[in-house]
């Protein structure tokens, strides 16, 4: 028997057709398999009832590449966090965020994260490895299966730095679009910033939204909060964002987590406005998403008072910088951005 693409999840329509033909089956069997994997979300080839029984039995032992759900936690607002177990025993987290018109999935790109941002729970757990293509796609299918509705938006804002797993993440973006049917303009890639990688991303002919996690308006403070920033001067990062917008025609969003008494003062807002005006001088669009901090047990930072948040917005708007305060979802389910954490592992008895 010819080698089967393993895992099946992540294989393109043409690859699955070619495999079916190599098995002595008509090409449309590969098309059927593609539909059952990406649209029906099967977990085993035994579920593909349109296949001839003999052939289904011959190939049923080959893995689709789906992860198992270890834990599911639902918040009062309907946000659901999934703890997923990978084939090698590693654990990742995925968040499904529903609204009346959208279903957004916050996907992870790595097990843990090497960036070690001082305020981030994922950064505190360290880095294990990059995720593989099927492990990223599986997160979207898991949420789609659980909610019983199509995923409309995907944000790479879960565990990990996507641009440190760039090739696989770009493969995943293309597959989300071509195989699962999610528009590229409904996909957001969030990055803290990795030298030379934003320029690389701009050359990939994608139409995704780039979200850059700034979290500070000056280099000194940013290095305190994000150790890796010492290798990527803020002025260079902003210039790379400007070049990205000019090359792709896509707006860049800037993420800014507000930490009480640390980066949320009026002087910080004015510095941030001045910084971003560098990127907007050529008429390119930019937008700031302000994220009031979600407290975690691993860090001493606090959430700012709402009046402080409103004043920060006012200062930005006075300087013609558009800003939105992001609605925090899933706080009671421990699922909001920055709260992906190892609570499950800590609940297990003994040493792991």
From Swiss-Prot:
This is Probable dual-specificity RNA methyltransferase RlmN. The gene is rlmN. Its main location: cytoplasm. GO terms for molecular function: 4 iron, 4 sulfur cluster binding; metal ion binding; rRNA (adenine(2503)-C2-)-methyltransferase activity; rRNA binding; tRNA (adenine(37)-C2)-methyltransferase activity; tRNA binding. S-adenosyl-L-methionine binds at residues 160-161, 190, 213-215, 294. Reaction proceeds by a ping-pong mechanism involving intermediate methylation of a conserved cysteine residue. One of its GO terms (cellular component) is cytoplasm. It comes from the Bacteria. InterPro entries: Aldolase_TIM, Methyltransferase_A, RlmN_N, RNA_MTrfase_RlmN, rRNA_lsu_MTrfase_RlmN/Cfr, rSAM. GO terms for biological process: rRNA base methylation; tRNA methylation. Its EC number is 2.1.1.192. Residues 99-332 form the Radical SAM core domain. Its cofactor is [4Fe-4S] cluster. The active site is at residues 93, 337. Binds 1 [4Fe-4S] cluster. The cluster is coordinated with 3 cysteines and an exchangeable S-adenosyl-L-methionine. The keyword Lipoprotein does not apply. It is found in: Cytoplasm. [4Fe-4S] cluster binds at residues 113, 117, 120. It catalyses: adenosine(2503) in 23S rRNA + 2 reduced [2Fe-2S]-[ferredoxin] + 2 S-adenosyl-L-methionine = 2-methyladenosine(2503) in 23S rRNA + 5'-deoxyadenosine + L-methionine + 2 oxidized [2Fe-2S]-[ferredoxin] + S-adenosyl-L-homocysteine; adenosine(37) in tRNA + 2 reduced [2Fe-2S]-[ferredoxin] + 2 S-adenosyl-L-methionine = 2-methyladenosine(37) in tRNA + 5'-deoxyadenosine + L-methionine + 2 oxidized [2Fe-2S]-[ferredoxin] + S-adenosyl-L-homocysteine.
């Amino acid at each position: 028997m010819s080698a089967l693409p393993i895992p099946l999840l992540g294989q393109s329509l043409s690859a699955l057709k070619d495999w079916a033909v190599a098995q002595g089956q008509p090409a449309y069997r590969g098309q059927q398999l593609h539909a059952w994997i990406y649209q029906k979300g099967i977990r085993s080839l035994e579920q593909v009832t349109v296949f001839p029984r003999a052939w289904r039995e011959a190939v049923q032992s080959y893995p689709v590449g789906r992860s198992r759900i270890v834990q599911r936690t639902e918040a009062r607002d309907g946000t659901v966090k999934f703890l997923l177990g990978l084939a090698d025993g590693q654990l990742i987290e995925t968040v499904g965020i529903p609204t009346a018109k959208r279903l957004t999935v916050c996907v992870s790109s790595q097990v843990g994260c090497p960036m070690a941002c001082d305020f981030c729970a994922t950064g505190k757990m360290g880095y294990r490895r990059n995720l593989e293509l099927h492990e990223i796609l599986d997160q979207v299918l898991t949420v789609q299966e659980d909610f019983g509705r199509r995923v409309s938006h995907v944000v790479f804002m879960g565990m990990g730095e996507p641009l440190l797993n760039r090739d696989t993440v770009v493969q995943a973006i293309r597959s989300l679009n071509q195989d699962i049917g999610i528009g590229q303009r409904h996909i957001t890639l969030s990055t803290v910033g990795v030298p030379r990688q934003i320029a690389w991303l701009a050359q990939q002919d994608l139409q995704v939204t780039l979200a850059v996690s700034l979290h500070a308006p000056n280099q000194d403070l940013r290095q305190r909060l994000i150790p890796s920033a010492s290798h990527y001067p803020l002025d260079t990062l902003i210039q790379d964002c400007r070049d990205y917008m000019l090359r792709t025609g896509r707006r860049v969003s800037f993420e800014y987590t507000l930490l009480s008494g640390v980066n949320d003062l009026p002087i910080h807002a004015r510095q941030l406005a001045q910084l971003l005006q560098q990127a907007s001088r050529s008429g390119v669009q930019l937008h700031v998403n302000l994220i009031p901090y979600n407290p975690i047990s691993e860090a001493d930072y606090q959430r700012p008072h709402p009046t402080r948040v409103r004043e920060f917005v006012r200062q930005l708007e006075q300087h013609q910088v558009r800003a939105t305060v992001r609605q925090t979802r899933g706080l009671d389910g421990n699922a909001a951005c920055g709260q992906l954490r190892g609570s499950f592992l800590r609940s297990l008895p003994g040493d792991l």
